[in-house]
Amino acid sequence: MNRASTRKIRAVAKHVRMSSNKARRVAHQLRGCTYMEALSILNWMPHRACYPILKVLRSAAANAYHNMGIDKGFLFVLMAEVNEGPIFKRFRPRARGRGYPIQKPTCHISITLEDVTDSNSIMVKK
């Protein structure tokens, strides 16, 4: 097996203060895209989840360049996943001295990029 075609680069952001469902709908759009396509998708989408996902994507590309010397033009998004993180539990003051619980969800965003310099099989986005 050719070593150059199997290099994978990963970046993770943990405890992002956002619902995992809201971040997932953005992350699903990135799978199978090249790095440049994913950047343009994230720059034009109007969702709040785009900014932390964009930071993770840029971090993964920087890891590829600095750690392995891979040019950003040869990267594509192999996997973009969003998992649930811990939930911050707080209380909201209400009338008559009561308190109602509120939950502030967090999520973990991880993006895996793959180098396709010697590989001819780039996944086609469906």
Swiss-Prot record:
One of its GO terms (biological process) is translation. It comes from the Eukaryota. Keywords: Chloroplast, Plastid, Ribonucleoprotein, Ribosomal protein, RNA-binding, rRNA-binding. One of its GO terms (molecular function) is structural constituent of ribosome. InterPro entries: Ribosomal_uL22, Ribosomal_uL22_bac/chlpt-type, Ribosomal_uL22_bac/org-type, Ribosomal_uL22_CS, Ribosomal_uL22_sf. It is found in: Plastid, Chloroplast. Gene3D superfamilies: Ribosomal protein L22/L17. It holds the Pfam family Ribosomal_L22. The keyword Nucleotide-binding does not apply. PROSITE patterns: RIBOSOMAL_L22. GO terms for cellular component: chloroplast; large ribosomal subunit. Belongs to the universal ribosomal protein uL22 family. This protein binds specifically to 23S rRNA. Part of the 50S ribosomal subunit. This is Large ribosomal subunit protein uL22c. It comes from Cryptomeria japonica (Japanese cedar). The lineage of its organism: Eukaryota, Viridiplantae, Streptophyta, Embryophyta, Tracheophyta.
